[in-house]
Curated annotation (Swiss-Prot):
Protein name: Hydrogenase maturation factor HybF
Residues at which Zn(2+) binds: C73, C76, C89, C92
Binding site for Ni(2+): H2, E3
Gene Ontology process terms (BP): protein maturation; protein modification process
Annotated HAMAP family: HybF_subfam, HypA_HybF
A Pfam family matched in the record: HypA
Keyword Zinc: yes
Gene Ontology MF, one: zinc ion binding
Keywords on record: Metal-binding, Nickel, Zinc
Biological source species: Escherichia coli O6:H1 (strain CFT073 / ATCC 700928 / UPEC)
InterPro entries reported for this sequence: HybF, Hydgase_Ni_incorp_HypA/HybF_CS, HypA/HybF
Coiled coil (UniProt feature): none
Length: 113
């Protein structure tokens, strides 16, 4: 369950930002999850609640936004949207793709009190 370590990293980022800006309470967090990140929403929600306990983010609302993955096709030299790791290029059907975005979990926004 790598969702737990991803959420721990996210909460560390949130804590650092809260300390830098003298924030006492985080009320909402938006996480951006890439289509190829291999994380399950239910596991993220469960893990996030656990790692937020005792932090400025405890009890905050968690919003999850999904982001499609983008890859560079070496065969047709185009940036394309993909939805799985073993995808083919939707333009030329080539299989030589380099994933550029969409394989991460990012703290996109934090709402504070």
């Amino acid at each position: 369950m790598h969702e737990l370590s991803l959420c721990q990293s996210a909460v560390e980022i949130i804590q650092r930002q809260a300390e830098q800006h003298d924030v006492k309470r985080v009320t909402a967090v938006w996480l951006e999850i890439g289509a190829l990140s291999c994380v399950e929403e239910s596991a993220v929600r469960f893990s996030f609640e656990i790692v937020c306990h005792g932090t400025v983010a405890q009890g905050c609302d968690l919003h999850i936004v999904y982001k499609p993955a983008q890859a560079w096709c070496w065969d047709c030299s185009q940036v394309v949207e993909i939805h799985q790791h073993d995808a083919q290029c939707p333009i030329c059907h080539g299989e030589r793709l380099r994933v550029d975005t969409g394989d991460s979990l990012i703290v996109k926004s934090i709402e504070v009190e």
